[in-house]
UniProtKB/Swiss-Prot annotation:
EC annotation from Swiss-Prot or TrEMBL: 1.2.1.19, 1.2.1.-
Protein name: Gamma-aminobutyraldehyde dehydrogenase
Entry superkingdom: Bacteria
Extra information: 4-aminobutanal can spontaneously cyclize to 1-pyrroline, and 5-aminopentanal to 1-piperideine.
Database matches in PANTHER family: ALDEHYDE DEHYDROGENASE-RELATED
Pathway assigned to this chain's UniProt record: Amine and polyamine degradation; putrescine degradation; 4-aminobutanoate from 4-aminobutanal: step 1/1; Amino-acid degradation
Family: Belongs to the aldehyde dehydrogenase family. Gamma-aminobutyraldehyde dehydrogenase subfamily.
Function statement: Catalyzes the oxidation 4-aminobutanal (gamma-aminobutyraldehyde) to 4-aminobutanoate (gamma-aminobutyrate or GABA). This is the second step in one of two pathways for putrescine degradation, where putrescine is converted into 4-aminobutanoate via 4-aminobutanal. Also functions as a 5-aminopentanal dehydrogenase in a a L-lysine degradation pathway to succinate that proceeds via cadaverine, glutarate and L-2-hydroxyglutarate.
Residues involved in NAD(+) binding: A146, P147, W148, K172, P173, S174, E175, D209, S225, I226, A227, T228, C280
Organism: Escherichia coli O127:H6 (strain E2348/69 / EPEC)
Pfam families (alphabetical): Aldedh
Length: 474
């Protein structure tokens, strides 16, 4: 397995402390990788800064060609990437290969095209004898911090728009799941000029802090927890860096009495538990209207009970393990606290799986109240709660009564209600009669403590640019 860092176009071994990388399906160590040293972090940023002088002035066509080549290489090595992701994350291999790899390839191809469409406004004469124009220029060096739930996907979401806009990137994948990013580094080094892409390995304290705090870094892009986002914003405040934050969510799933209950059950069974629920948009916080509540709980409980946990290599496996032992304990603790309320009922699941690996049973909890922790706090595991509501006004208020604001869904046959409720929800995305549908052309990003900035779409590309005014006297 490729375990070297990419710095200035060369694969080099880390010079810092070695860290174990685990196989969560078995709970054993896959390998140990040496972190980047402080000197190597500095070297990576300096290399990116030096490369920016030329890369930032390349034509959109040239940048697009590099991105398309990278997309092709990922596609050609799709099986290799899927196997690495499966071993390092515990994802079912068939899901990694069939769902994630095509989406990752599409992200690079989308931004290759978008790079050639980015422009500033052609302005005019707002002062006699002077012509103004607006430019959208790259910022410089971008430090990108990727999470452990979708390691390669999130690396793509960060690399593609930043590079398309003309920036140079230093990427730090999670120390828990670095293998696909390091493999990507190996393939990218022969496509992009030296220094344009750099990939480091290490923990937040030893590598993340010196990277994000480096004076030559102009922007920091993070997908991670609220706590990590707070830390980076505070850490980078003295240098006034631009920050781009995607910090998780607790998606409300609003089910009205007139909803297609079979569609709701199928949707939540799939999108509440996909990737073992380790998804910031997971359909995890159901609000069911009183007329449909009992039926939904019964049917959804039966459906969730059929979800198959197992080996990532098994074609029939739907749920793999959680990412780490520490995360397994966090999920288990959240469910135990919910049980202890006395009014929350475990419909199915609610326990760790016996045997090797970090498995938690797919869980459905009914009877949750608005102020319960299981409703208000992100669990990030295969755990879905159901809360009863009376009317539209109440459920909109409850849905918005959350520190999160990333994703939501509304299930109803009433088109007017769908538009009305969607307009009032304080979430970056609202799906109607579906959930978890993502396309490269549409923006993904939240509000409130879920963060700010957009991934994907032309809005995502613009986030990696600076708007400049040029005035010419004539």
């Amino acid at each position: 397995m490729q375990h070297k860092l990419l710095i200035n176009g060369e694969l080099v071994s880390g010079e810092g402390e070695k860290q174990p990388v685990y196989n969560p399906a078995m709970g054993d160590v896959l390998l140990e990788i040496a972190e980047a040293s402080a000197e190597q972090v500095n070297a990576a940023v300096r290399a990116a800064d030096a490369a920016f002088a030329e890369w930032g002035q390349t034509t959109p066509k040239a940048r697009a060609e590099c991105l398309l080549k990278l997309a092709d290489v990922i596609e050609e090595n799709g099986q290799v990437f899927a196997e690495l992701e499966s071993r390092n994350c515990g994802k079912p291999l068939h899901s990694a290969f069939n769902d994630e790899i095509p989406a990752i390839v599409d992200v690079f191809r989308f931004f290759a095209g978008a790079a050639r469409c980015l422009n500033g406004l052609a302005a005019g004469e707002y002062l006699e004898g002077h012509t103004s124009m607006i430019r959208r220029d790259p910022l410089g060096v971008v430090a990108s911090i990727a999470p452990w739930n979708y390691p390669l996907m999130m690396a793509a979401w960060k690399l593609a728009p930043a590079l398309a806009a003309g920036n140079c990137v230093v990427l730090k994948p999670s120390e828990i799941t670095p293998l696909t990013a390091l493999k990507l580094a190996e393939l990218a080094k022969d496509i992009f000029p030296a220094g344009v892409i750099n990939v480091l390995f290490g923990r937040g304290k030893t590598v993340g802090d010196p990277l994000t705090g480096h004076p030559k870094v102009r922007m920091v892009s993070l997908t991670g927890s609220i706590a990590t986002g707070e830390h980076i914003i505070s850490h980078t405040a003295p240098s006034i860096k631009r920050t781009h934050m995607e910090l998780g969510g607790k998606a409300p799933v609003i089910v009205f009495d007139d909803a297609d209950i079979e569609a709701v059950v199928e949707g939540v069974r799939t999108f509440g538990y996909y990737n073992a629920g380790q998804d910031c948009t997971a359909a995890c916080r159901i609000y069911a209207q009183k007329g449909i509540y009992d039926t939904l709980v019964e049917k959804l409980g039966a459906a969730v009970a059929t979800l198959k946990s197992g080996s990532p290599d098994d074609e029939s496996t739907e749920l793999g393990p959680l990412s780490s032992l520490a995360h397994l304990e966090r999920v288990s603790k959240a469910v135990e606290e919910a049980k202890a309320t006395g009014h929350i009922k475990v419909i199915t699941g609610g326990e760790k799986r016996k045997g090797n690996g970090y498995y938690y049973a797919p869980t459905l909890l009914a009877g949750a109240l608005q102020d319960d922790a299981i409703v208000q706090k992100e669990v990030f595991g295969p755990v879905v709660s159901v809360t009863l509501f009376d009317n539209e006004e109440q459920v909109v208020n409850w849905a918005n009564d959350s520190q999160y604001g990333l994703a939501s869904s509304v299930w109803t046959k009433d088109v007017g209600r769908a538009h009305r409720v969607s307009a009032r929800l304080q979430y970056g995305c609202t799906w109607v009669n579906t959930h978890f549908m993502l396309v490269s052309e549409m923006p993904h990003g939240g509000q409130k403590l879920s963060g700010y900035g957009k991934d994907m779409s032309l809005y995502g590309l613009e986030d990696y640019t600076v708007v400049r005014h040029v005035m010419v006297k004539h």
